[in-house]
C-alpha cells in the first residue's frame, strides 16, 4: 500500500515517517534549554514567560543537540524535513475508510509564504513549535486599527444585518461552514462597495501553488498537491489611471445609477470596466501599523511587504481571468476546508445576507422560486441536482403581529434552490471578473501610527520577482531546501537578533559571534 505522501503527491513527497509530526505545545516534554529560567524580566511578564517556556520546550526537543551544548541547531529535524506535511497539514490514512485525512491545516496563507520576512530560522522555530504567535500589545493595537478602518467603510452593512437578526430573533451559527459563508458574503459586499464608493477593505483572495515545482497553478486545480494559499487584502482603491495620488478614490455612485439586482449589476460592472479601462484602475495596498512614525529599516521586512501585496494582486488577476475557473477554485477552497458546498445555510445566515447586501435580495427570491440566477455553471448544476428540503416554515411564527417584518414572509417557506456556499461562490467569481481588467501595476504599502497614515510606499508589480519568490518559498515548505538564516554579519545580528525569542539559544547566532571574535584575534596578530 502506498504511503500518505506517495498518494498525496507522487513524485515529490518523501516516505511518511512513523515519527510523524511535531509535538504540540500542550504535550511537550520538559527538555529545558540552557537559558530557561533566565528570561529578561523586562520582556517576560507572566503570560509571555509562560508562553516562551512552553515554546522552548517543544523547539528544544526537536532542535536541541547535545554536541551543540544545548543550543538550537539550524537544520530541519531529521524525519521532519517537509514542514508542510510534517507540521502544517499532518496527513494520515484513515484506517476505516482508507482516505487521507488531515490532523493539521492543509493550506497556507500569503503571510506563511513570507518565510524570510525577519529571519527564516526564527520562522522555522516558530513553525515547528506548533504554537500561535504571542499576541503582543503592538499586535493588538494593529488589529484595532485595521478593524476601525474596516468598520468606517463597511460597518453600515454589518449593522443592518445585526438589526434584522435581532428583530427576527434569529442568529447566525458560528460553525466553520457559516463562518466561511459570512466571509464570502462579506467579500461580495466589499467588491460592490469598491465600484460604488471607490474603495474596499479586507477583501478575501486566494490562489494555489504546486508542491511539485513551486509554481502558481494557473489552470484548473486537479491535484491534492496543488496547495491552497489564502489572503486578505487590506485596501483596494478605484482611482484615476495616471492620477496624482493612488489613494484618491473615485466615487462612481455620485454620478452613476447602479442596478440594485446582482443579476443586472454584474453585466453593468463588466461593461463599465471595459469602457473605463483606459481611465480607471484598481490599486491594491497593504496597511502596516507602527509604534512610531518611522518605516522599517530592515531590507527583508521592506522586501517581503512588497511581495505580500504582489501575491494579492496576482491572486486577484488569476481569479478574474476566467470566471468559470474562479467558481471552481472557490468550491475547491471550501472543500479543502472539509466543508460541503451544497449544505443548506441557516435562516439567520440568509436574512443576514439579504439585509447586509441588498443587491442579493432579488437573488434570494430566485432561489426560493427555483429560478436561474444567470450564471451558467451554477444554473446548470441546480437544474439536475437533487436537493434536500430547504424549508424555513418553522420560522414563520416570528412574523405574527409584526407588520414591519412581513417583507420576510416569502422567505419563510420552502425554497426550491437552497442558499449555500455554491451560490455565494457563483456571485464572488463574477465580481472578481469585474475587478481583474482594471488591476493596476502600481501597488501600495500604507504605514499608520495612531490611526493616521504617515507614509505611503508605492512600487510596481514585478511578476518575475514574485514567481522567483514563490518557487523559493515552496522549496522550503515542501522539503526541497534547508533553512536559510540571515547572513551572519554584525549588522544583521544587531538588527535581527535583538528582538528574537531565540537569541540566547540559537546556534547560528552563537557561531556568528564566535566567528567575529576569532577573526578579531587573527587581525590583531597581523604584523
From Swiss-Prot:
One of its GO terms (cellular component) is mitochondrion. Its main location: mitochondrion. Binds 1 [4Fe-4S] cluster. Its cofactor is Mg(2+); [4Fe-4S] cluster. GO terms for molecular function: 4 iron, 4 sulfur cluster binding; DNA binding; metal ion binding; single-stranded DNA 5'-3' DNA exonuclease activity. The keyword DNA-binding applies. It is found in: Mitochondrion. It comes from the Eukaryota. The keyword Nucleus does not apply. [4Fe-4S] cluster binds at residues 119, 497, 500, 506. GO terms for biological process: interstrand cross-link repair; mitochondrial genome maintenance. It holds the Pfam family Exo5. Its EC number is 3.1.-.-. Residues 1-23 form a transit peptide. Keywords: 4Fe-4S, DNA-binding, Exonuclease, Hydrolase, Iron, Iron-sulfur, Magnesium, Metal-binding, Mitochondrion, Nuclease, Transit peptide. InterPro entries: Exo5 (IPR016610), EXOV (IPR019190). Belongs to the EXO5 family. Single strand DNA specific 5' exonuclease involved in mitochondrial DNA replication and recombination. Releases dinucleotides as main products of catalysis. Has the capacity to slide across 5'double-stranded DNA or 5'RNA sequences and resumes cutting two nucleotides downstream of the double-stranded-to-single-stranded junction or RNA-to-DNA junction, respectively. Monomer. This is Exonuclease V, mitochondrial.
Amino acid at each position: 500500500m502506498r504511503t500518505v505522501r506517495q498518494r498525496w503527491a507522487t513524485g515529490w513527497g518523501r516516505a511518511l515517517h512513523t515519527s510523524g509530526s511535531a509535538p504540540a505545545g500542550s504535550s511537550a516534554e520538559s527538555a529545558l534549554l540552557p537559558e530557561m529560567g533566565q528570561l529578561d524580566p523586562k520582556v517576560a511578564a507572566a503570560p509571555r514567560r509562560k508562553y516562551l517556556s512552553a515554546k522552548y520546550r517543544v523547539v528544544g526537543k526537536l532542535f536541541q543537540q547535545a554536541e551543540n551544548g544545548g543550543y538550537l541547531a539550524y537544520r530541519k529535524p531529521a524525519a521532519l524535513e517537509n514542514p508542510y506535511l510534517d507540521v502544517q497539514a499532518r496527513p494520515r490514512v484513515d484506517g476505516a475508510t482508507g482516505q487521507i485525512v488531515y490532523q493539521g491545516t492543509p493550506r497556507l496563507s500569503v503571510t506563511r509564504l513570507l518565510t524570510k520576512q525577519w529571519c527564516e530560522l526564527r520562522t522555522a522555530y516558530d513553525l515547528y513549535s506548533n504554537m500561535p504567535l504571542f499576541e503582543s500589545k503592538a499586535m493588538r493595537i494593529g488589529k484595532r486599527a485595521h478593524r476601525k478602518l474596516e468598520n468606517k467603510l463597511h460597518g453600515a452593512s454589518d449593522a443592518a444585518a445585526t438589526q434584522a437578526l435581532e428583530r427576527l430573533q434569529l442568529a447566525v451559527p458560528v460553525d466553520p461552514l457559516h463562518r466561511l459563508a459570512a466571509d464570502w458574503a462579506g467579500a461580495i459586499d466589499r467588491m460592490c462597495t469598491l465600484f460604488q464608493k471607490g474603495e474596499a477593505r479586507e477583501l478575501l483572495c486566494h490562489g494555489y501553488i504546486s508542491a511539485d515545482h513551486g509554481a502558481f497553478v494557473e489552470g484548473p486545480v486537479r491535484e491534492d498537491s496543488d496547495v491552497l494559499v489564502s489572503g486578505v487584502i487590506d485596501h483596494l482603491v478605484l482611482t484615476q489611471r495616471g492620477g496624482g495620488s493612488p489613494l484618491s478614490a473615485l466615487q462612481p455612485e455620485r454620478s452613476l445609477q447602479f442596478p440594485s439586482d446582482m443579476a443586472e449589476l454584474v453585466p453593468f460592472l463588466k461593461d463599465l470596466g471595459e469602457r473605463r479601462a483606459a481611465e480607471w484602475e484598481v490599486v491594491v495596498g497593504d496597511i502596516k501599523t507602527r509604534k512610531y512614525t518611522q518605516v522599517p529599516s530592515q531590507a527583508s521586512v521592506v522586501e517581503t511587504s512588497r511581495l505580500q501585496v504582489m501575491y494579492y494582486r496576482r491572486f486577484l488577476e488569476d481569479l478574474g481571468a476566467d470566471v468559470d475557473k474562479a467558481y471552481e477554485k472557490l468550491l475547491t477552497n471550501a472543500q479543502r476546508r472539509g466543508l460541503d458546498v451544497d449544505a443548506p445555510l441557516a435562516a439567520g445566515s440568509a436574512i443576514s445576507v439579504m439585509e447586509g447586501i441588498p443587491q442579493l435580495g432579488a437573488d434570494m427570491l430566485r432561489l426560493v422560486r427555483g429560478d436561474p440566477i444567470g450564471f451558467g455553471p451554477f444554473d446548470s448544476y441546480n437544474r439536475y441536482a437533487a436537493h434536500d428540503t430547504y424549508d424555513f416554515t418553522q420560522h414563520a411564527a416570528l412574523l405574527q403581529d409584526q407588520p414591519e417584518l412581513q417583507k420576510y414572509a416569502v422567505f419563510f417557506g420552502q425554497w426550491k434552490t437552497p442558499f449555500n456556499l455554491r451560490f455565494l461562490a457563483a456571485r464572488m467569481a463574477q465580481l472578481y471578473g469585474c475587478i481583474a481588467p482594471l488591476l493596476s501595476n502600481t501597488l501600495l504599502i500604507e504605514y499608520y501610527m495612531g490611526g493616521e497614515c504617515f507614509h505611503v510606499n508605492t512600487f510596481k508589480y514585478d511578476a518575475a520577482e514574485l514567481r522567483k519568490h514563490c518557487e523559493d518559498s515552496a522549496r522550503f515548505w515542501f522539503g526541497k531546501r534547508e533553512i536559510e538564516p540571515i547572513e551572519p554579519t554584525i549588522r544583521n545580528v544587531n538588527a535581527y537578533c535583538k528582538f528574537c525569542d531565540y537569541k540566547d539559544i540559537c546556534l547560528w547566532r552563537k557561531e556568528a559571534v564566535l566567528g567575529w571574535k576569532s577573526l578579531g584575534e587573527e587581525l590583531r596578530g597581523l604584523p
